[in-house]
Amino acid sequence: MIKIISGIQSTGSLHIGNYLGSISKNINLQNKYQLNLFVANLHTITVDFDPTQARQNIIELVKIYLASGFDTNKNNIFLQSEINEHAALGHVLLCHTTMGELERMTQYKDKKQKFVQSNQTIKIPTGLLTYPTLMAADILLYQSDYVCVGDDQKQHLELTRDIAIRMNKRYGELFKVPEPIIAKVGSRIMDLNDPSKKMSKSSLSKKGIINLDDSREEVLSKIKSAKTDNLNKVNFDYKTQPEISNLVSIYYGAINDHFNLGLKSAKFNKALDEEVVPIDIIKHFENKSYKDFKEELFELIWNILDNIQTNMKKITDEDVMRVLKSGKDKLLPIAQKTLLKVYQKLGMVI
């Protein structure tokens, strides 16, 4: 079976951008492929974090995946830090990467500006620079066919492929070179009140974020107050109508979510496995107002959140521990086999 690897950081307080941009897409893939999903808690510590919340954040993240419909009978979820081969292979890959390659990463360039000191020096955590090689290890360790990443991780995946090709050429076949799965629409959900900024829990305005644990009233209020323009015409063009285009992107992700299959069929007369695309949404709301659009958007978003919140109440911490152990037990032998092969090719085994 074709295998996909995907990771998500356990930073707490997940929002609809996290869900539609990553979780929902992973859930939709799991019936066609074997999905190996890891909680990327080693990546979480590359920047400032709260160790007192780390364990609970992991538990909550796994609960959300299970509540969202992650099928552990066919797929695996595991904790990155429990498989030491991630860090070990990460070091090997780091030794086959140049400083120039790492410093060219756009995310590194953007994030390092946050560490400018009062005297204009920059105090950058080393983990921020070396993040891409650990990510490369996460991917290459399991010989996956595809990797599901967000648009903002595309450059990191290109570096991963470069490293794999480089090492395969030098040492012989070590790694399968993975192909990306990157959604063209909906992989990057923007703030409801500022479509120039990615939806983030660190946003100054909480009205721009729909959290997965928001109440019905909170979701309704946030969608009603979401910024639009004065054209009152549903369209999908980020250059001319960025506000409504962002909401259409959210609608697109929500209508194609597995929790909304019934609503998709009723509203668009689509087969269960047939995707609603932005042009369908524009036609659906032709001659309708933004008010009509927001009412339907609320219906879709709340149906997702209501299902997740209801399912979450049934999942215990013990369920999480059992699922993580099962995932580790299945993935550890694969990781060990890959790392041993690398060590042997590099002459590191006596």
Swiss-Prot record:
It is found in: Cytoplasm. The keyword Nucleotide-binding applies. A motif ('KMSKS' region) lies at residues 198-202. InterPro entries: aa-tRNA-synth_Ic (IPR002305), Rossmann-like_a/b/a_fold (IPR014729), Trp-tRNA-ligase (IPR002306), Trp-tRNA-ligase_bac-type (IPR024109), Trp-tRNA_synthetase (IPR050203). GO terms for cellular component: cytosol. A motif ('HIGH' region) lies at residues 10-18. ATP binds at residues 9-11, 17-18, 150-152, 189, 198-202. Pfam families: tRNA-synt_1b. It comes from the Bacteria. It catalyses: tRNA(Trp) + L-tryptophan + ATP = L-tryptophyl-tRNA(Trp) + AMP + diphosphate + H(+). One of its GO terms (biological process) is tryptophanyl-tRNA aminoacylation. L-tryptophan binds at residue 138. One of its GO terms (molecular function) is tryptophan-tRNA ligase activity. Keywords: Aminoacyl-tRNA synthetase, ATP-binding, Cytoplasm, Ligase, Nucleotide-binding, Protein biosynthesis. Its EC number is 6.1.1.2. Belongs to the class-I aminoacyl-tRNA synthetase family. Catalyzes the attachment of tryptophan to tRNA(Trp). HAMAP family: Trp_tRNA_synth_B. Homodimer. This is Tryptophan--tRNA ligase. It comes from Mycoplasmoides gallisepticum (strain R(low / passage 15 / clone 2)) (Mycoplasma gallisepticum). The gene is trpS.
